[in-house]
Every structure is written in structure tokens, then in C-alpha cells.
């Protein structure tokens, strides 16, 4: 695999573990990506869409009430304000433009929470590309507002009835479709995972999150934060936040995986800290798997974090100790979801609530510590209000 233009590995993680038929397709994608990155016209069009269609830059908001009684300053990077309601829109615009540049006439994608599906549907509507979204049947049920949004924007949503009917099954179906239709079709992967060049490409199309955050925090506080905190499922919002801070050794990078019903129950989605390295979804990375290599079911209250693996760059950052990965339970995330709504008037996505919950935990552990924290508020919580309502009002 040494004949790729970019390094397909992060340390031992990553690579291109796909059927032989897809190797030239991935290499063609890598070539197109490298050419686009070096093309001022492509960059100008991407930047214009981010600004005038998606609404970048997004705000960096100081929490006025959540930190009362402590010496912490807590800022939120407001990806929830982006068109589409989450950070997903950033890289989807990049990939959709790239697909168009490559002459692809059809887009496919997988989605869990439905946010990536919505972002793909809106980009395809705007760029006039037909799109098919694969979504686990279980997720179609728990994310009905997003399913309606996708269909409203002209996407075909296919509920996947196989396996656990969740995100991992949607990924497998999308990969199958791509292997059959790669000549006309671009598979628009929704996270910084999968075979090379996807993890690198998605990071590059998301890294403005951290770049903007750095500029904004220096403007407001005249210094870098002590830590940036982001939720980790596949890992795209987190790598988008971390990328520009990796070289800033004074800034702690904290990724928050879902502990679900508690790590000890086995019902979680924390492969980085509680999985083993294996091959899945076209890459070598930590996976939740049985001793004989069967992929285990991941679980999280948040559909977008319910993924049994993680992007290879996070695995690498964890292995060298540059980033710290922790986990937060459903209950802790729900508490943070309510706290932000009640005290700041912002309803966060359940995914983002995991990152917020860990920040609140840090503050509670040491209220007298003067610290500057930034949480990546990766998406808004409209899609989750029915789930939360069910739980708070005595449902399951």
C-alpha cells in the first residue's frame, strides 16, 4: 500500500482493508482529494459554501450560569448553530463537492442519529445529486424527525433490517452498495473512520472547528484553553476540534466515549478504552469484539455514538498519550442535557451532552481550580427531545 499519495496509517492504525475491487476506487478518491486540496478554485467554492450556505464561522459561547460557584470559564463551540443542526454539514459539503468534481452522479451514505443523513440530503439537494441513505431500522424509529427531513429534501432512506438494525449494519449495506456501483457512486462516509483516505479527508474537511476555536479563544481570553473536550463515536467532531491543537502541547485533548448503561454492563460504545484492535469497516482500529472476533453490539442512548469502533487517528492519539479518552453514562449525559437547557437556554444533542457532562464533572471535582475549558457542542438536540421526553416521563 506504499503507492498511496498520503500515509494511510496513523501509527499502526488505519489502512485500506477493503475488497480488491475497491482499492483502485479509493486511490482515485485520494488523488482527487489531493488535487482538490491544492486547487484554489475548489477551496474558494468550499469556503464560500461554508460561509454563505452553512453559516460559518460558528459562535464560541461563554456559559454564564453553569459554572457558578466555580473558578472555571467554560466555552461552547456552537456547531449546533450550523445549517443542518450539527458539525456534519462541514465535511459533507467538502465530500459532495469532491464527488461532483470526480463526475460521480449518485451519492450514498450511512447514518445513525440521522444528522449525517440530513447533512448529506441537504448538500445533495443543493448540488443537484440524487442520494440514498442507509439507516438501521432501529434508528429510523428513534430518529423519525430526521428521517422526515431527509425524505423532504429528496433523499431515499432505506431502513436496514439486518443484524442489530443499527449504524454498523447501515455501514455494511452502504459498503455493499458501493462495491456494486462504484463507477457512478460516491460513498459519503459520515465520520473520520473507514478505509484510507476517509479518516484524513474527513479531518481536513472538519478542522475549521478547531482553527476557528483557536482564533476565537485567543480573541476572548488572550490565551489557549487548558482543555478541549469532544464526544467520540466514529470521531469526526472530535478530530475536527483536536487537529489544530495537537501541536499545542499545553492544551489537553479529551475525547468522551459513551459508557451507556455502565462499562461493567457491557452495554456501552467505548472501544478505545474497552475494546481490542481488529479490522472493521475497512480499517485497523479498536473494536468491540468477542474473543473469537465477532463484532459486539455497541450501545448508547445517543444514536450517533452507538458505533462499535472509532477513527484510527483517535486510536493513535490514545496510543501515544497525546489525547485522553474517558467515558460518560447515559444518565450523566441526560443530566448535562437538562442542565444546559435549564441554565443556558441551549438544547444540545445527546452526543454533545456526553462531552458537556465530562466538563461538568471536571468542574465539580475541583471548583476552586482556575481553568479554561472548551466543549465542542457538536449538534443541537431537537432530534432527541422525544427520546428524552420518553425517559423523563416514565418511558424506557
From Swiss-Prot:
HAMAP family in alphabetical order: Trp_synth_beta
Identification of the protein by name: Tryptophan synthase beta chain
Similarity-based family: Belongs to the TrpB family.
Sample GO molecular function, one term: tryptophan synthase activity
PANTHER family attached to this UniProt entry: TRYPTOPHAN SYNTHASE (PTHR48077:SF3), TRYPTOPHAN SYNTHASE-RELATED (PTHR48077)
Gene it is expressed from: trpB
Pathway listed: Amino-acid biosynthesis; L-tryptophan biosynthesis; L-tryptophan from chorismate: step 5/5
Lineage, broadest ranks: Bacteria, Pseudomonadati, Pseudomonadota, Gammaproteobacteria, Pasteurellales
Reaction(s) the record says it catalyses: (1S,2R)-1-C-(indol-3-yl)glycerol 3-phosphate + L-serine = D-glyceraldehyde 3-phosphate + L-tryptophan + H2O
Entries under InterPro entries matching the protein: Trp_synth_b_CS, Trp_synth_beta, Trp_synth_beta/beta-like, TrpB-like_PALP, TrpB-like_PALP_sf
Keywords annotated in UniProt: Amino-acid biosynthesis, Aromatic amino acid biosynthesis, Lyase, Pyridoxal phosphate, Tryptophan biosynthesis
Record note on quaternary structure: Tetramer of two alpha and two beta chains.
Domain of life: Bacteria
Top class in the EC scheme: lyase
An annotated GO cellular component: cytoplasm
Pfam families in UniProt: PALP
Amino acid at each position: 500500500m506504499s503507492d498511496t499519495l498520503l500515509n494511510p496509517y496513523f501509527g499502526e492504525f488505519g489502512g485500506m482493508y477493503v475488497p480488491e475491487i475497491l482499492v483502485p476506487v479509493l486511490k482515485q478518491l485520494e488523488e482527487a482529494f489531493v488535487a482538490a486540496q491544492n486547487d484554489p478554485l475548489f477551496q474558494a467554492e468550499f469556503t464560500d459554501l461554508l460561509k454563505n450556505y452553512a453559516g460559518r464561522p460558528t459562535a464560541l459561547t461563554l456559559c454564564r450560569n453553569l459554572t457558578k460557584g466555580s473558578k472555571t470559564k467554560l466555552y461552547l463551540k456552537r456547531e449546533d448553530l450550523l445549517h443542518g443542526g450539527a458539525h456534519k454539514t462541514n465535511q459533507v459539503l467538502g465530500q459532495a463537492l469532491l464527488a461532483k468534481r470526480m463526475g460521480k452522479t449518485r451519492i450514498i451514505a450511512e447514518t445513525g442519529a440521522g444528522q449525517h443523513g440530513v447533512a448529506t440530503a441537504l448538500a445533495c439537494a443543493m448540488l443537484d445529486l440524487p442520494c440514498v441513505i442507509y439507516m438501521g431500522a432501529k434508528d429510523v424509529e428513534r430518529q423519525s424527525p430526521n428521517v422526515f427531513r431527509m425524505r423532504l429534501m429528496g433523499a431515499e432512506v432505506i431502513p436496514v433490517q439486518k443484524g442489530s438494525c443499527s449504524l454498523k449494519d447501515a455501514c455494511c449495506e452502504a459498503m455493499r452498495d458501493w462495491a456494486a456501483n462504484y463507477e457512478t457512486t460516491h460513498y459519503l462516509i459520515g465520520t473520520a473512520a473507514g478505509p484510507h483516505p476517509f479518516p484524513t479527508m474527513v479531518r481536513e474537511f472538519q478542522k475549521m472547528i478547531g482553527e476557528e476555536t483557536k482564533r476565537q479563544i485567543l480573541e476572548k481570553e488572550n490565551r489557549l484553553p487548558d482543555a478541549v473536550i469532544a464526544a467520540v463515536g466514529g470521531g469526526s467532531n472530535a478530530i475536527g476540534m483536536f487537529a489544530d491543537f495537537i501541536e499545542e502541547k499545553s492544551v489537553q485533548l479529551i475525547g468522551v466515549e459513551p459508557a451507556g448503561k455502565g462499562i461493567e454492563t457491557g452495554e456501552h460504545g467505548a472501544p478505545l478504552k474497552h475494546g481490542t484492535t481488529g479490522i472493521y469497516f475497512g480499517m485497523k482500529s479498536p473494536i468491540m469484539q468477542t474473543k473469537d472476533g465477532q463484532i459486539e453490539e455497541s450501545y448508547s442512548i445517543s444514536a450517533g455514538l452507538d458505533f462499535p469502533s472509532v477513527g484510527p487517528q483517535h486510536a493513535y492519539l490514545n496510543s501515544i498519550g497525546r489525547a485522553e479518552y474517558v467515558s460518560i453514562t447515559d444518565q450523566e449525559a441526560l443530566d448535562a442535557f437538562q442542565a444546559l437547557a435549564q441554565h443556558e437556554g441551549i438544547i444540545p444533542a445527546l452526543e454533545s451532552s456526553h462531552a458537556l457532562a465530562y466538563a461538568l464533572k471536571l468542574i465539580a471535582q475541583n471548583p476552586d481550580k482556575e481553568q479554561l475549558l472548551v466543549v465542542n457542542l457538536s449538534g443541537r438536540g431537537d432530534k432527541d427531545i422525544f427520546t428524552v421526553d420518553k425517559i423523563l416521563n416514565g418511558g424506557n
